[in-house]
Amino acid sequence: MNYEESRAYIRAAELKKGIVLGLDNMRELMRRLGDPQDELKYVHVAGTNGKGSVIAYLYSALSGAGYRVGRYISPAVYSYRERMEVNGEPVSREKFAAYVTRIAEVIDDIVKEGKPHPSVFEIETAAAFLYFQDEKCDIVLMEVGMGGDLDATNIIRTTVLSILVSISMDHTAFLGNTLSEIAEKKAGIIKPDSHMVTVKQQPEAEAVIRRICEEQNVPYEVADRDDAEVLEASMTGQTFLYKGEKYTISLAGAYQKENAVAALRALEILNEQGYPTTQEQRQDGLKRTTWPGRFALLGTKPDFVVDGAHNPAAADMLAASVERYFKGRRIIYIMGMFRDKDYRKVIRKTEKYADTILTIAAPDNPRALSPGELADAVREFHSDVRPYDDIESAVAEAYHLAGTEGVIIAFGSLAFLGDLTEIIKKHNGGNND
């Protein structure tokens, strides 16, 4: 297969198999591929919101310290191949095609034996393991796809460190209807006799994580956002004090302090586990971290911000950031949501800041609410809402409504943020300022 054929193969697999939780298929697939995952060292990250940001901080700091660092994330924002990278370089088209070709041959044998066809995420995760093995990574930063205990990434037997970011209600159809049930699934990545760190969790989630740590003989370590004091914050970044040292980050979201503190606590633990970094490397790593679609300022006059808030907890964080930076300004929203998310709660938590809300849909995505459906839901809470069938028209209208002094905030599913970002860049004459 060439690259285009490998992508077509994956799209076809999506039609055969949707979301699958359980490790039997993955174990069978990886066994036939030679279990490349067993040759690597991992930092495994689970939770509802903040996984990508914490991984971005660690990736920057560890790469800057000279380690060969693999990173596996989903979804990608700009390029599909961003899902698997080593030291800032995405997997090449040729290598990705070769991995998928090899995996497809193994899957043919599996299916001929009457066993289930692996899911898209299982195929992608298998390709990532093959890639990181080939690249001889010193350490791999692995983001859970959904949940934790039964996620395809949890095929790994040991971890250098498990990290739990903020846990809240999401994917309830798969993970459970209470915070305790969801925390149980996500804390399933904690391996016996290993190390873990969690951000400060809600009491129900904390109780579950403490119990699992005790059962697995793992010290319960908390990265507490209250240990950091914000000294200054603007849309271009934040400076905070943590354990007597100053750190600057370029990510503006009010919630980024928590993610940065989680990364710093993780780096302290990794220091003791054979991955030392200096104070300067940690400071430089955090300062250099970029992460698209996380309360990111992509243009000025008007200010144009994009954010991946797609569930109620993320909506709370978005609201806090809007309150911090844009209170009293004229605000236009561009919103796109998936139908399997609690979009009504997202609307309810954010609508009061908007003068006008424009609704769009992620292109060619069956999970996306149509602009009309989303507009109908918004009208339950907000009177000035306008649906747009294409993203470019919505952006043009947002610029018209905002003028030069207003604020445009595009948020919701990351699936449309890549397209949106390209449109904004074009509007700005090809650069981001």
Task: Briefly describe each language-model feature range.
Residues 1-47, 54-67, 71-72, 108-116:
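Short functional linear segments
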Residues 39, 139-142, 150-163, 167-171, ...:
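Nucleotide phosphate-binding/pyrophosphate-handling subdomain across enzymes
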Residues 202-221, 236, 303-306, 312, ...:
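C-terminal helical cap/extension that packs against the catalytic core
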Residues 111, 135-139, 143, 159-246, ...:
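Acidic, Mg2+-coordinating active-site environments of NTP-dependent enzymes
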Residues 135-138, 328, 403-405:
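Short, high-confidence coil segments that cap the C-terminus of an alpha-helix
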Residues 28-30, 35-38, 64-157:
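ATP-dependent carboxylate-amine ligase catalytic core
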Residues 413:
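Active-site-proximal loop/hinge segments that shape catalytic or ion-binding/gating pockets
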Residues 73, 199-200, 212-234, 250-254, ...:
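Beta-strand->loop->alpha-helix junctions that form or flank phosphate-binding loops
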